[in-house]
Design a protein with these regions (language model features):
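PP2C/PPM-type serine/threonine phosphatase catalytic domain
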Residues: 1-247
């Protein structure tokens, strides 16, 4: 089984800086989206540190199980970001979301902190793999809110877990057995807050009707179409998306 991918990050229509960072490597089987937060250059610095630290840690710790190294690589990024923030007052309080997929053998190990997401598309069905670490998601989990009520809450962007703000973090890791023709989507909230799950599925299916015949051009035009739709729907935030097809 081989991997085909395409990625794109875009500043959007309302922000003066792009605080998202992405990492994409078919060879390593590693794909990361990080959505930074923090004043001045904090968000850019945090997300950039995450996408540099995680691959380095993974490559240097292949003796660990894929599940362990997926979690520990994010924890290492958390430590690096926190330490730099403590050393440099102008960066204190910076942080980032992280969502990553690490392919090893027949499995995909999906880990996350924050509200950047991973989706799986298989046989024209879309499934959200990750769970947002947000105040809204916690209320949904407790049946306090429906998803419709949550969408209208003014505090919908408040995160309860991020990378770089606290010394100890719990990283969610999901293990999934990959099947041929599976399509994985990683994205920041600049995409999923502006483009519905059904529209994400429609755009992917329209551009990749048959995953086993897809090529790099098909994947590239898909990520371009997803970003364009987020901008057409307001483009309030930076937008990042990575698409991975298992062939």
């Amino acid at each position: 089984m081989s991997l085909l991918s395409a990625s794109l990050t875009d500043i959007g229509l309302k922000r003066s800086k792009n605080q998202d960072s992405i990492y994409s490597s078919n060879e390593e089987g590693l794909f990361i989206v990080a959505d930074g937060m923090g004043g001045h250059a904090g968000g850019e610095t945090a997300s950039n540190l995450a996408v540099k630290t995680i691959p380095k840690y993974l490559n240097e710790n292949q003796n660990q199980s894929p599940n362990e190294v997926s979690s520990n690589s994010v924890k290492k990024a958390n430590q690096v970001i926190l330490e730099l923030g403590n050393k440099m007052p102008e960066l204190k309080g910076m942080g980032t979301t992280v969502v990553q997929i690490y392919f090893k053998g027949p499995f995909a190990y999906v880990s996350n902190l924050g509200d950047s997401r991973s989706y799986l598309i298989n046989k024209s069905q879309l499934y959200q793999i990750t769970r947002d670490h947000s105040l809204i998601q916690e209320k949904i989990n407790l049946n306090i809110y429906t998803r419709e009520q949550a969408a209208a809450d003014p505090n919908k962007n408040v995160l309860v877990r991020t990378c770089g703000l606290e010394e100890n973090v719990d990283v969610d890791v999901f293990t999934y057995k990959v099947r041929r023709n599976d399509i994985f989507v990683l994205c920041s909230d600049g995409l999923h807050s502006k483009v519905s799950d059904s529209d994400i599925l429609h755009i992917v299916n329209k551009n990749i009707p048959d995953p086993k015949k897809a090529d790099e051009k098909d994947l590239h035009q898909t990520v371009v179409a997803l970003v364009a739709q987020a901008n057409a729907n307001g483009g309030n935030d930076n937008i990042s998306v990575i698409l991975v097809v298992a062939q």
